[in-house]
Amino acid sequence: MELNSFDHKYVRILDIWGNTFEGLAVTFPAGYGLHVFDRDEESIRIEDYYIFASDIKEIKEIEVHGTVELASRWLTIRRYEQEDAKLIYEGLGRDEEMFRYTGWNPYATVEMAEETVREFIDSYNDPHFYGWALELEGILVGTIGAYDYDPESNSIEVGISIIRTFWGHGYATEALTAVLKYLTENEKIAHVTAGCASDNLGSRKAMEKAGMKLVRTEAGGLEVDGKVYDKLFFEYSGAEGEKE
């Protein structure tokens, strides 16, 4: 198996033991100096893992694009800019209602918002990082992202926040619909998941309207500030989502 043709390409590897590895490949010729493994053959490294040629059952180059600009009927779904941090803090971070059902606020201060946005921007080199600002006629109305990509199940989780001033206009459904389509059809991710508290009717309605299906309910599965909610799990699998 000629591994050097995959050097510095994004690949998915299935080894002979059934393990899956996915990421940017760096290849090494036989005899490169990996004698610590006592194996003189070609190898490939993905993150901290070395896989030798004879252990590879299947290797495939995959095309991923990461966070690209999308458009829907009313929204521009774009990459973050550092200038967004202050607007996100003012629109989301200062509004306790935004985190009523999560208890987690990464924008609680201007400094936290700036650091979070900076981390998002720094992550754009990762082809499986997906983070967007939602813009309506030049005005920031919310954020959406997908995270925790799992190559074993070819799945990812999606989350969205709309600034309260813009609730009730269908923007969450519109953004979700565009992102779900992009992730399954363009990125070929088979399963996109999401979760919310049972009392979070707005999120539930947006996910259902975007085509996500309720697949599981965990009784008492979410506790926020001493309040216990059932946790609802949703999933979307686009027609083009399954990988070969």
Task: Specify the residue positions occupied by each region the protein language model found.
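A short helix-loop-beta-strand connector motif used in the catalytic cores of GNAT acetyltransferases and
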Residues: E119-A133
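Conserved RNA-binding domains used in RNP assembly and mRNA/RNA metabolism
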Residues: M1-V64
